[in-house]
């Protein structure tokens, strides 16, 4: 392991000890924001410290095994060779783990997200598929212990949604869903197709980190235009009789957000403002990424909505992620929310890309 990496790890261990001490101080305990932030930092540092302790122990085991090779007892020498082999394997594995821990961390990984799904080409079938995607993400969220709430929805004429915007909140939501942005294509025979022909439709997905208040996304009240309108009811039930739905336009950028699913105008306005801040935060993130032109383009894609990232082929029961050439013949499981078999390879590919970038520096 390079000396620079060891020095970085040592500084993290010292910081872990410092944070541990701070968390027991009365002044920190009484300040909820500081206590929360330090608790998060501690939870990030804890696995690094544990891995480094294992690494240090493996180095000691290796040294002890080397010394045993000089023994005259043949049985002890054989035992030493086996222990040396195990120690070298452990060192190699732990060095890889520690390198990944040291990768630059996305500051938004812990954020909640706004998930936008829009029907694209394909008419009614695209709307139906957007509904299928929303169910898929809802089931995945449930499996992860996350919560999901609908912010705004425009239903399709024959089912599904022309557009649905939801908020997903829980632990590490953005870290797992950030690679879902892009165009999702479906190939299947629609229920209305009498000739049995396969149709191709598409939906676009956008995943945006929710802007935290501490991130300082300030919006000048003079820069926004707020309109109220009557929320549409579902199937004629609970139709809103008042103009409680909110549409906010951010005049400098032209960004428009709507919210109509909360019970009051006040709640709809708060949700719409939160979504607007997240859109402006995402725009800032996109701008920064474009400015970093010298940085290698991520193998898992730019997150551009127009970029086709995945195909769901129903006749073959196949899902293909085009960014990493991953093909799985488990479409039914994926649509039931078993997304880890796709998401984890994307995360690993992203980590490998970052490691390659670090080695080039």
Curated annotation (Swiss-Prot):
UniProt biased composition (Basic and acidic residues): 287-297
Pfam families: PCRF, RF-1
One Gene Ontology cellular component: cytoplasm
Subcellular location: Cytoplasm
Coiled coil regions in record: none
Keyword Transport: no
Disulfide bonds: none
Residues bearing PTM N5-methylglutamine: 237
Post-translational modification: Methylated by PrmC. Methylation increases the termination efficiency of RF1.
InterPro entries: PCRF, Pep_chain_release_fac_I, Pep_chain_release_fac_I_sf, Prokaryotic/Mito_RF, RF-1
Protein name: Peptide chain release factor 1
